[in-house]
């Protein structure tokens, strides 16, 4: 094991902005002036929860001089991409590699995947046929429903083994009927999050399956925040309002899509009235650990957002849709823990394409595990002062995020 100047932290740099097709050889060529520790074994790509390259990598080097040479490569190009180079350390590298990728410590190996984009009228037989050759456990398909008891167009499928679930991910973007189906890694915990008791919902007329986006009859999945003073408590309430076990339900999903091909029924389930000072309606969170994004490019997709926060693994992304049926440039991103939400704040004012993104924290420490958080947060670039301001060292996490919305007096009020 190589020893560094800080008690075994080694000589590590992190690269960001790598092309998706980047290879170890490409990294070696980019850092040709540096000596990489253990050669090819010293390059560690970071993967998304779907098993794809995230565009980031850690590289172990031989000496402090090699680190200095690597840092001089910051903002130089690899192909058509310019690469950012940051100084890192072994603690950050080990933590990130452990908590990223499809086989991360954060991913329960229970054989679940999540489907999104199921077509109108999709039946249980079609889901089984979609995964033909992959064994699904008895009663292994869960169909979430919206507050009115209607199927949402998503499904959870549990396979007989984790290996089969990994194979199922290979069906991503294949078709059922005329619809491309997205397949994501999931867990039993995520399935359970859909079974929590629903809050009191606002009655809004649901459209028929062929209504166009932007019409007055569009179904808006907004909820009244029960027992909270708007958003000032800093904690969303959990639950999407029950789920329906696999029992042959095949009701109409009422899907429609926006200009970018996203399912409005899904996007709108995460929409809230964005007149922040006046509205009592907020998006529900399944975890209570949320980061709000502002300034997104209008063509930004959920994958863009997942990649933006990489190597962190958001639980869910809600892209906001305005009353006119168009994206607003804002989104809510849920994380599994308070520590991950705080770590995500290190990306505040970072760029997505040509836009810099503002982030606002809305999370509480109730479900956090702080034993490792201070070291990890600093490794992720979050200062102790920011962590304190964000609630890691404070018992009071109310008001700032909500106040920033209510009066728009704060551009970045963290909890």
UniProtKB/Swiss-Prot annotation:
The modification Phosphothreonine is found at residue 215. Its main location: nucleus. Signal peptide: none annotated. One of its GO terms (molecular function) is single-stranded RNA binding. One of its GO terms (cellular component) is synapse. Gene3D superfamilies: 3.30.70.330. The modification Phosphoserine is found at residues 104, 107, 161, 187, 193, 195, 265. GO terms for biological process: mRNA processing; regulation of RNA splicing; RNA splicing. Residues 11-90, 111-188, 289-366 form the RRM domain. SMART domains: RRM (SM00360). It holds the Pfam family RRM_1. CDD domains: RRM1_hnRNPH_hnRNPH2_hnRNPF (cd12729), RRM2_hnRNPH_hnRNPH2_hnRNPF (cd12731), RRM3_hnRNPH_CRSF1_like (cd12506). There is a cross-link at residue 72 (Glycyl lysine isopeptide (Lys-Gly) (interchain with G-Cter in SUMO)). There is a cross-link at residues 87, 167, 185, 200, 224 (Glycyl lysine isopeptide (Lys-Gly) (interchain with G-Cter in SUMO2)). The modification N-acetylmethionine is found at residues 1-2. It is found in: Nucleus, Nucleoplasm. Keywords: Acetylation, Isopeptide bond, mRNA processing, mRNA splicing, Nucleus, Phosphoprotein, Repeat, Ribonucleoprotein, RNA-binding, Spliceosome, Ubl conjugation. Sumoylated. The record marks 16, 20, 52, 75, 116, 120, 150, 173, 294, 298, 326, 349 as: Interaction with RNA. The modification N6-acetyllysine is found at residues 200, 224. Residues 81-86, 179-184, 355-360 are annotated as: Interaction with RNA. Identified in the spliceosome C complex. Interacts with AGO1, AGO2, TBP and TXNL4/DIM1. The N-terminal RRM domains are responsible for recognizing the G-tract of BCL-X RNA. This is Heterogeneous nuclear ribonucleoprotein F. It comes from Mus musculus. The gene is Hnrnpf.
């Amino acid at each position: 094991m190589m020893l560094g100047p800080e008690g075994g932290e080694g000589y590590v740099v992190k690269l960001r902005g790598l092309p998706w097709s980047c290879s170890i050889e490409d990294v070696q060529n980019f850092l040709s002036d540096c000596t990489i520790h253990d050669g090819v074994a010293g390059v560690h790509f970071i993967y998304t929860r779907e098993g794809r390259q995230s565009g980031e990598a850690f590289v172990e080097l031989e000496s402090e001089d090699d680190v200095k040479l690597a840092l001089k490569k910051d903002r130089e190009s690899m192909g058509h991409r310019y690469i950012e180079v940051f100084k890192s350390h072994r603690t950050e590298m080990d933590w990130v590699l452990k908590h990223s990728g499809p086989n991360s410590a954060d991913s329960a190996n229970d054989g679940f995947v999540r489907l999104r984009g199921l077509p109108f009228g999709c039946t249980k037989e079609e889901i089984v046929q979609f995964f033909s050759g992959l064994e699904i456990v008895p009663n292994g398909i869960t169909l979430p429903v919206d507050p009115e008891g209607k199927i949402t167009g998503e499904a959870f499928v549990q396979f007989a083994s984790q290996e089969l679930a990994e194979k199922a991910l290979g069906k991503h973007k294949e078709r059922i009927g005329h619809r491309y189906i997205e397949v994501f890694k999931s867990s039993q915990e995520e399935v359970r999050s859909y079974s929590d008791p629903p809050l009191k919902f606002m009655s809004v007329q649901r459209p028929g399956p062929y209504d166009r986006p932007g019409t007055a009859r569009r179904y808006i999945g907004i909820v009244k925040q029960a027992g909270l003073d708007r958003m000032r408590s800093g904690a969303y309430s959990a639950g999407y309002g029950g789920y329906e076990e696999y029992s042959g339900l095949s009701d109409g999903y009422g899907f429609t899509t926006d200009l970018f091909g996203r399912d409005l029924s899904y996007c709108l389930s995460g929409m809230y009235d964005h007149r922040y000072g006046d509205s009592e309606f907020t998006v529900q969170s399944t975890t209570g650990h949320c980061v709000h994004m502002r300034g997104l490019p209008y063509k930004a997709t959920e994958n863009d957002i997942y990649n933006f926060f990489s190597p962190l693994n958001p639980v869910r992304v809600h892209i906001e849709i305005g009353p006119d049926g168009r994206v607003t440039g804002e989104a809510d991103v849920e994380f599994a823990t308070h520590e991950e939400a705080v770590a995500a704040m290190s990306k505040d004012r970072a760029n997505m394409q040509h836009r810099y993104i503002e982030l606002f924290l809305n999370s509480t420490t109730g479900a956090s595990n702080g034993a490792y958080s201070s070291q990890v947060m600093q490794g992720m670039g979050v200062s102790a002062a920011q962590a304190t301001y964000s609630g890691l060292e404070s018992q009071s996490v109310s008001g700032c995020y909500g106040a920033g919305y209510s009066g728009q007096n704060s551009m970045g009020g963290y909890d």
